[in-house]
Amino acid sequence: MSETVEQEFAPGNHPDLPPPIRTTGIIGWSRKNLFSSPLNTILTLLTLLLLWKSLPPLFEWAVVNSISSADSREQCWNQMSSPGAGACWAFIKDRVELFTYGFYPHELRWRVNISFLLLALALVPVLYEKLPHRKYGLLYSATFPFIAGWLLVGGFGLESVDTDQFGGIMLTLIIGVTGISFSLPIGVALALGRQSNMPVLRILCVLFIEFIRGVPLITLLFVASTMLNYFLPPGTVYALLVRVLIMVTLFASAYMAEVIRGGLQAISKGQHEAGDSLGLTYWQAHRLIILPQAMKISIPGIVSNFIGLYKDTTLVLIIGMMDILGLGNASLADAKWAGLAMEVYIFVALYFFISCFSMSRYSLYLEKKLHTGH
């Protein structure tokens, strides 16, 4: 049998043996990441011990002893062996519409549902490069904010809805998606302006970036709430939501500009010279050579800014806007469900974790896809 195997391959062309099983798969990953040194081994064992002690009671509280059907906290506790022995998810079930739509009129919530669906469709051409006829999809994505604004606010044949009635997950998505969508292009423009050879433009960009970065977001939200109307033309009054969107976008743009500027500075001078040697103009060289490389380098920082901005949307509760966290806090004041803060904060934490973890995983996917180093 061995002679037959040896005759199948010419000398020197025998295929390589598979790598040792200890260096591949889950075993190899564990050896490399969890047990690579004595310190890592100790930390891994301590973490496993902590999980072994904490996960079973948590699972018992959140799943085994939980109550999903009740009309009040007392009814939940009456169904348990002892008060608080399990999670009362009936509270979340009772308030899920409030947490999703805020105070949006019940009979008009179909418009919010359509907006959620259109948002998902608008993300498809942005996230998937190989989508057929992607340029038309990107055109739709660019027009989505105006379509969603018309659906949510009304007008042009639809019943108008005051933005003060926006709240919950809907408000969180509006602020987060708007800030993320507009901060990236504005940040690119500010980063290019800061590196411009035109002194006036460069100074204006530097002043804007440094001023915004030196002021807490809470301060800007208070400015949006109380002072921004004084800087507008007489007789011009914008809704609080519009003013908040402006301030959040400007705040995120300043931080985005610094992230992208770091990517631009990482590009070697030879790349600029390559564009000059091809006879490209400044804008052509940046569009085709410089910016794509800078954006690839900046992906971790960009997504980190997106995640931070999305979590910062909870700060709007300070100026009286009821996002998902604000509505959760307000719901705890209801005597019928008082004392169930744990369930509320776990629900809010899970929502933000799923959203932010999804952005983080997509960032890793992009980094691996665009990795062209050797």
Over which residues does each language-model region extend?
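Transmembrane alpha-helices and adjacent helix-loop boundaries
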Residues: 2-374
